[in-house]
Swiss-Prot record:
Cofactor note: Binds 2 Mn(2+) ions per subunit in a binuclear metal center.
Highest taxon above the source species: Bacteria
Chain residues that bind Mn(2+) 2: 42, 80, 115, 196
Protein's UniProt name: UDP-2,3-diacylglucosamine hydrolase
PANTHER family: UDP-2,3-DIACYLGLUCOSAMINE HYDROLASE, UDP-2,3-DIACYLGLUCOSAMINE HYDROLASE-RELATED
Originating organism: Haemophilus influenzae (strain 86-028NP)
Signal sequence residues: none
Gene3D superfamilies: 3.60.21.10
């Protein structure tokens, strides 16, 4: 039966090879069987520009390119850790870059896709930070810096983010229910798929269904499968 996959929040990095191993297994064994693959952000733990090169980056690029070359339509939506992924990465992998909110039709279902961080409006400090780093002039300036400098800046930002999370409540870091409902209504859909919060779940709400993709962990890959009958669910070992 025809089907597609949705994943997010893998946070791939050299420091967690077990996550890379899960991704390799998925891309070699499951992904080639799909019609479409949607990666909804935070594929990498951080991204400092398309000009960065490493064995991990090349391995990930090659895996995606291989799946794309086998006829799978691959899509990428930016996360809060890899929002600087650009056209060079897209060209190298064959993915199509998606905007912050993307409306798709899949197996006769209208679906709204987003990474999920834009729905967490109660986290005002993060939203201010997000608006700042998404300014195009600031991104261009950052990308002009030497790679070594960018790495230092990215590591400091990541450390500050991890520190800030310790002081924030779980409620603040989750989606705002009213705002999320407004977005669903704005795009006139009854199915929303997002990641970011690392709280894998399928929420059947009154007016719509909200599917939250989970983060990938040492022994678990959060993979949502949707088939042509319209059925969907997370793959369980």
């Amino acid at each position: 039966m025809k089907h597609s996959y949705f994943i997010s929040d893998l946070h791939l990095s050299e420091t967690q090879p077990e996550l890379t191993a899960l991704f390799v297994d998925f891309m070699q064994n499951l992904a080639p069987q799909a019609e479409r693959l949607y990666i909804l952000g935070d594929l990498f733990d951080f991204w400092i520009g398309d000009d960065e090169q490493s064995a991990l980056i090349q391995q990930v690029k090659d895996l995606i390119k291989s799946v794309s070359n086998q006829g799978v339509q691959c899509y990428f939506q930016h996360g809060n850790r890899d929002f600087l992924i650009g056209e060079r990465f897209a060209k190298d992998t064959g993915v199509q870059l998606l905007p912050d909110y993307q409306l798709i039709t899949l197996y006769d279902k209208k679906i709204l896709l987003c990474h999920g961080d834009t729905l967490c409006i109660d986290d005002e400090a993060y939203q201010q930070f997000r608006r700042r780093v998404h300014q195009k002039w600031l991104q261009r300036l950052f990308l002009c810096l030497p790679l070594k400098v960018r790495v230092i800046i990215a590591e400091k930002i990541r450390a500050k983010s991890n520190q800030d999370k310790q002081a924030k409540s779980q409620e603040i870091m989750d989606v705002n229910q009213a705002f999320t409902a407004e977005k669903v209504q704005e795009f006139d859909v009854n199915l929303l798929i997002h990641g970011h919060t690392h709280r894998e779940a399928i929420h059947q709400q009154e007016e719509f269904t909200r599917i939250v993709l989970g983060d990938w962990r040492k022994n678990y890959a959060s993979i949502l499968k949707m088939d042509e009958s319209g059925e969907f669910g997370f793959i369980k070992d």
